[in-house]
Amino acid sequence: MEDVELTLTPDDYSLLTDLYQLTMAACYVGENIDQRRASFEITVRRLPPRCGYLIAMGLAQALDYLEKLRFSSAQVEALQSIGIFDHALAQFWTLLREAQFSGDVWAVPEGTAIFANEPLLRIEAPLWQAQLVETYLLNTLNYQTLVATRSARMRDVAGADATLLEFGTRRAFSPQGALWAARAALAAGLDATSNVLAAVKLGRKPSGTMAHALVMALSATEGTEAEAFTAFHRYFPGAPLLIDTYDTIAAAHALSDQIKAGNLQLSAVRIDSGDLGSLSRQVRAILPGVAIIASGDLDEWKIAELKAAGACIDGYGIGTQLVTGSPVNGIYKLVEIDDIPVMKESPGKITYPGRKQIFRRVENGIVQRDRLSLIHETPDHEQPLMQLVFKQGQRMQESDSLSTIAERTRASVASLPPSVRDINQPESIPLDLSDHLSALIEKTRRKTAES
């Protein structure tokens, strides 16, 4: 097969979907229901293991996708050439050529803590449009919510004063995923990313240290580890140095001697291997005025262990465990069509009918419970979480800044009870179903059984 360019651009958005979204759209056209008003909601049935909450993230990219979704003539011709749509009506091709998202979008703001069975986002649009966008929306919301949740948990465990650096680009699932991961991490409270492209695009200063390769290469060619450090500081004065290539403690002593002699200014050292707790305490005694950064497959549990063991660590470089991990299995399900509520009743995969709102009860700054209600219901000393962000295909407002989202994340996590923030055996916030929603569930079940 001939090699082709597979780098994603906004021009590709229309075809970045599963085939069945297009075949269903063609069927809707044939059955003359493609323009029926449909509502789909994204929810998560179950939280990932040992996770008491999720941090919603990815809305900005979802709205960007909806704004730019178009089919080019070449893309329509490509679909026509594959032989799958030979029986599709001519109106289907006209629909694609003129495609532009014209619906409404309701969503919880990025950085908001949410729980199982609560909608992150709702699409209200002509049926064929609402169907088509499922794949991309789940892709961006699921992944960024995963990274944001892990970032928020690590920040919660490490504390507000710790420096947290996103180092996950090499372990992310794709170059695009690496950019989304960097954004989600920064928006959920991490201090910086090593991903240069992400940092530049997001208006942030990238952060990083050095790799063992530089120490080994310069040690081999210039004589010693100390000379490798001197060479690096010649171009990046005071920059953090990686000191565990050969002997962490010996390197720390050598640097201490240079500092005492007035020959060196040093902002930080990084330790990437060994017993991080023990090594950090020894290095702190040798270099008391130098920040210590730890890295090496760290996650919230390892950070908690290090803190409990009295490790002298000022910052953490977090990579693999941040950008991978247990997936967020968000689902995108039809809840209403032409004002007719619908629900799925498969065992273990039940969905709730109707367009819904989340009402959150907060007392003395702490979340007490959530209530899942229908959109016509009103709050009872509660906060409505879902907001109208897109109306008739147009944004209602500009996307929030990363700093705004990061502050929302911080406040949202701080409002959760300690039992929900626990990283080992977390509880979840109680979710009540309103009387109106409960009645609608029973009514929809009876109607389904009768039909």
Describe every region a protein language model picked out.
Residues 209, 213-367:
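Glycine-rich phosphate/ribose-binding loops and adjacent secondary-structure elements
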Residues 1-235, 265, 331-451:
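Ordered alpha/beta subdomains of enzyme catalytic regions
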